[in-house]
UniProtKB/Swiss-Prot annotation:
Protein name: Oxygen-dependent coproporphyrinogen-III oxidase
Region of interest (Disordered), ranges: 1-22
Gene expressing this chain: hemF
Its EC number(s): 1.3.3.3
Complex and partners: Homodimer.
UniProt source species: Synechocystis sp. (strain ATCC 27184 / PCC 6803 / Kazusa)
Sites where the protein binds substrate: S109, N125, Y126, R127, N296, G297, R298
Reaction it catalyzes: coproporphyrinogen III + O2 + 2 H(+) = protoporphyrinogen IX + 2 CO2 + 2 H2O
GO molecular function, one term: coproporphyrinogen oxidase activity
Pathway noted in the entry: Porphyrin-containing compound metabolism; protoporphyrin-IX biosynthesis; protoporphyrinogen-IX from coproporphyrinogen-III (O2 route): step 1/1
């Protein structure tokens, strides 16, 4: 049995600056603004409607939704900034040293559900936490196609890898494997999509992988790495900013390439069926959904990630050799998209 290395205590050089919360909060709001502006320009028709909200226990946020656009059937981009007396059990299980401390959390999240089945759904989330003596960054971005286009997957992964490599060359290999592990529907034994990057509890110390599976590919890869020089708070903040700003270059060219592809009822019905997997994941496994519900977050904002239309079909099986069959049989399996 492989045992994950214990995390190192945070040292003075890596402690957050006095204005850390203010700076990260400002960036998360700016990221929301930049993404919304970019998506409105890309869509060409729809406009985001903003809904500001306050949380009784402390904090609040801005929810923005674009519905019935040109390529977007529905998309939401959220900013939130909350604080309180105690982190929920789902996080304390991973960071028990935060127990008994007040917490602060801020982040931006996004889910886009396009109309055209040939344009993939996409998800993004970047977040920052402080709780007493501990702090960390988390987040990632992932792509969920309905029809298999290897060049789209390669472009998305290349763009995220370039953002990761500017901080450390081992970030992408670990966080890509972690993403494959995280966005997996155990009850279906299926990947949700073709992944991207996912990371959590990053405070600049080893190991890079901080997930629940000590024997999985992400943990095995992370554990065999040579010792990595500890990174400071500023390094990780810059990393989060680069990843956040890599989204539009990663996704926009895919939209432009696929938005005018003709489709019929067969493709639309398959898209709605596969959206069911998205709903299942978000309601059963998604860490952000669980955190929001456990901290009395705003339900409308938490469930903003769900598609406007979806369907389930009992014991559905795609036609052998069809693009629909290829999606799950060959495409939605962990693979090296960068070098494929």
């Amino acid at each position: 049995m492989t045992v994950s290395p214990t995390t190192q205590p945070q040292t003075n050089h890596s402690l957050p600056p006095a204005d850390a919360k203010q700076r990260v909060s400002q960036f998360m709001q700016t990221l929301q603004d930049e993404i919304c502006q970019g998506l409105e320009a890309l869509d060409g028709k729809g406009k985001f409607q903003e809904d500001s909200w306050q949380r009784e226990e402390g904090g609040g946020g801005r929810s923005r939704v674009l519905a019935d656009g040109d390529f977007l059937e529905q998309g939401g981009v959220n900013f939130s900034e909350v604080w309180g007396k105690s982190l929920p059990p789902s996080i304390l299980k991973q960071r028990p040293e935060a127990e008994g401390h007040e917490f602060y959390a801020t982040g931006t999240s996004m889910v886009l559900h396009p109309k055209n089945p040939y344009i993939p759904t996409v998800h993004l989330n970047y977040r920052y936490f402080e709780a007493g003596p501990v702090w960390w960054f988390g987040g990632g971005a992932d792509l969920t196609p309905y029809y298999p286009f290897a060049e789209d997957a390669a472009h998305f992964h290349h763009t995220l890898k370039n953002a990761c490599d500017q901080t450390h060359g081992e970030f992408y290999p670990v966080f890509k494997r972690w993403c494959d592990e995280y966005f997996y529907l155990k009850h279906r034994q299926e990947m949700r999509g073709i992944g991207g990057i996912f990371f959590d509890y990053q405070d600049g110390n080893a190991p890079l992988y901080r997930g629940p599976d000590p024997n999985g590919p992400a943990a095995q890869y992370s554990n065999q790495l040579a010792p990595i020089e500890p990174l400071g708070w500023e390094d990780l903040f810059s990393f989060a900013q680069r990843c956040g700003r890599a989204f539009l270059p990663a996704y926009s060219p895919i939209v432009e390439k696929r938005r005018n592809t003709e489709y019929g009822d067969r493709q639309r019905q398959f898209q709605l069926y596969r959206r069911g997997r998205y709903v299942e994941f978000n309601l059963v496994y998604d860490r952000g959904t669980i955190f929001g519900l456990q901290t009395n977050g705003r339900t409308e904002s938490i469930l903003m990630s769900l598609p406007p239309l979806v369907r389930w079909q009992y014991c559905y099986s795609p036609e052998a050799g069809s693009p629909e069959a290829e999606l799950t049989e060959k495409f939605l399996v962990p693979q090296d998209w960068v070098n494929s």
